[in-house]
Swiss-Prot record:
Gene3D superfamilies: DNA ligase/mRNA capping enzyme, Helix hairpin bin, Nucleic acid-binding proteins. This is DNA ligase B. Pfam families: DNA_ligase_aden (PF01653), DNA_ligase_OB (PF03120). InterPro entries: DNA_ligase_AS, DNA_ligase_B, DNA_ligase_CS, DNAligase_adenylation, DNAligase_N, NA-bd_OB-fold, NAD_dep_DNA_ligaseB, NAD_DNA_ligase_OB. Catalyzes the formation of phosphodiester linkages between 5'-phosphoryl and 3'-hydroxyl groups in double-stranded DNA using NAD as a coenzyme and as the energy source for the reaction.
Length: 561
């Protein structure tokens, strides 16, 4: 199906000095859109941390938060107030600050980060809720939510109800501060196939609600930091395992370079794990003394996240395509995003009715994933722009019997018919894609779908946008098309039958086809009464009959006397 480009309606984009792709909004609209998105994120954030309820998927929240930061940078706005972390309601100080972890974008960034660093280890980046555990004299005395990294909520009563978290410790761990991730326990979770499952929100919800003590049985703990613990990493892991924190040892691997990090990352992505992950964390065994730990300053560790299964993409335009049958389909053009190494810049919305139900306009943020065979799929609208400027769809007068002849209103269906007749299902004109047909039609103004048969080799060679080698290929394909069977020419005329049914009919000429009754068509494979009626309508159509006479004049097999 071809795009109704004259009816497209979109938004302009520009690049900021920071290199970010920015909407070309007037200052007033930019301020309004930023404020609205900022408020929405703040509302979701508040619900998440106060009620333990996720109003939006974790990945969507993270991506929209990043989008907000991008917009703020586009207009030179301060980004420090962006609500991407929990509100500071807790006042319990962390004995050791949570540093957070720097994100590495790709393999190249990982190679650069590991260069010059030694004694490296890689661990799964468990997707859950960060916590500090404080042990004194062998007993768990405090449990504190991450908060802002310096202070957070006192979670001690809830943490004491989680069976998987040791309540007592011995030896070096009798008096220790541990940092880790409380996660939703899973059995045989394969990240690549099962995705994130909103595990972070579910874990947070269990910790925050007051009436679900039994649900805490499904939570686990993964310790990823023992500040001021043993300097030797194997010794550190061994002592943690003996104390009941066995997952840390099981899922910590020594690595030498980015290749080994990548292998571990891929293995954990495709293997059955007891938790949901969203990447890996690379860390140096040697860490500074805990007194020097500060939020945002943990340069001894970094994360390499998995690409999200679905991406939030900004709609840049709405376009309409008209297929050869006259069906109108709505397509959303997107600011390009990468999904599974595939560059996605458009997604099929479906019919006009479905588009109207989705209520999608340029500037909206939609969630896109890949369906079977890597086809982009619209999952949901996650954010709507304040301004609802939508194009008007083309009229509904197109059908399976329109646009065999070119006209101003038939442009897109006519091109769709040319693309179809050149496909392997019809005449099999190798190398004839939409761009080639558009170039020929724009220059030579075809009267109907077979006008190209009258082109000379010189005319094709002089077509702007068609290279010499390409023009020779086109001329040869057009020449060979004349030798195609009568059945293939009828398929090129878009008879409403399958090729198998048409072959079963046994027609070898237009005259023979005209003599067939509706009863004859009904008896063909996969035809029936309704399709037989459509064949009769097609055969009696004036444009189809005019095309048959023109093909006869061109001495196409089966059409002459």
């Amino acid at each position: 199906m071809r795009l109704w480009k004259s009816m497209a309606w979109g938004i302009l984009l520009w690049h900021s000095q920071s290199g970010a792709l920015c909407p070309a909004w007037p200052p007033a609209r930019a301020a309004e859109e930023i404020t609205r998105l900022q408020q929405q994120l703040a509302d979701w954030n508040d619900i998440y941390w106060k009620q333990g309820v996720s109003a939006v998927d974790d990945s969507v929240y993270d991506q929209l938060s990043a989008r907000l930061v991008q917009w703020q940078r586009c207009v030179g706005q301060d980004v420090s107030s962006t609500p991407v972390s929990p509100p500071l309601n807790g006042t319990t100080m962390h004995p050791v600050a949570h540093t957070g972890v720097r994100k590495l974008a790709d393999r190249q960034a990982v190679e650069q980060w590991v260069r010059g660093r030694s004694e490296l280890w890689v661990q799964p980046k468990v997707d859950g809720v960060a916590v500090t555990l404080v042990y004194q004299n062998g007993k768990l005395t405090r449990a504190i939510s991450r908060g802002n990294g310096l202070q957070g909520e006192d979670w001690t009563p809830k943490i004491r109800l989680i069976p998987s978290i040791p309540q007592t410790t011995q030896g070096a761990l009798a008096n220790a501060v541990l940092q880790g991730e409380i996660f939703l326990q899973r059995e045989g979770h394969i990240q690549q196939r099962m995705g994130g499952m909103n595990a972070r929100s579910k874990a947070a919800g269990m910790l925050m609600r007051q009436d679900n003590a039994s649900a805490l049985n499904s939570l686990g703990i993964f310790i990823w930091a023992w500040p001021d613990g043993p300097a030797n990493m194997p010794e550190r892991l061994s002592q943690l395992a003996k104390a009941g924190f066995s997952l840390t040892k099981k899922y910590s691997l020594a690595v030498k370079d980015a290749s080994e990090v990548e292998r571990a990352r891929q293995s954990w992505l495709t293997s059955a794990l007891p938790f949901v992950t969203d990447g890996v964390v690379i860390r140096m065994a040697k860490e500074p003394a805990s007194q020097y730990w500060r939020p945002g300053q943990g340069d001894w560790l970094a994360a390499w996240k998995y690409p999200p299964v679905a991406q939030v993409a900004q709609v840049s335009a709405i376009q309409f395509s008209v297929g050869k049958s006259g069906k109108i389909t709505v397509v959303a053009s997107l600011v390009p995003v990468i999904l599974d190494d595939k560059r996605v810049q458009r997604v099929n919305i479906g019919s006009v009715k479905r588009w109207e139900a989705w209520d999608i306009a340029p500037g909206d943020q939609i969630l896109v994933s890949l369906a079977g065979q890597g086809i982009p799929r619209l999952d949901e609208v996650v954010w709507r722009s304040r301004e609802r400027s939508k194009p008007v769809p083309p009229g509904s007068h197109f059908n399976s019997l329109t646009c065999f002849y070119a006209s101003a209103t038939c442009q897109e269906q006519f091109i769709s018919r040319l693309v179809w007749l050149g496909s392997r299902s019809a005449l099999g004109l190798d190398g004839m894609g939409e761009a080639s047909w558009r170039a020929l039609h724009q220059t030579h103004r075809f009267e109907h779908i077979f006008s190209w048969l009258a082109l000379t080799s010189a005319q094709i060679a002089n077509t702007p946008g068609v290279a010499k080698g390409k023009s020779e290929q086109i001329w040869r394909q057009f020449y060979l098309a004349r030798r195609q069977s009568f059945t293939r020419w009828i398929m090129a005329m878009d008879i409403p039958l399958t090729q198998a049914a048409l072959q079963a009919s046994g027609d070898r000429s237009w005259e023979q086809l005209l003599m067939r009754t509706e009863q004859h068509w009904r008896q063909l494979p996969a035809t029936g009464e309704r399709r037989a009626g459509r064949v009769i309508d097609w055969r009696n159509n004036p444009q189809i009959n005019a095309l048959s006479r023109w093909l006869a004049a061109q001495h196409i097999p089966g059409f002459g006397s």
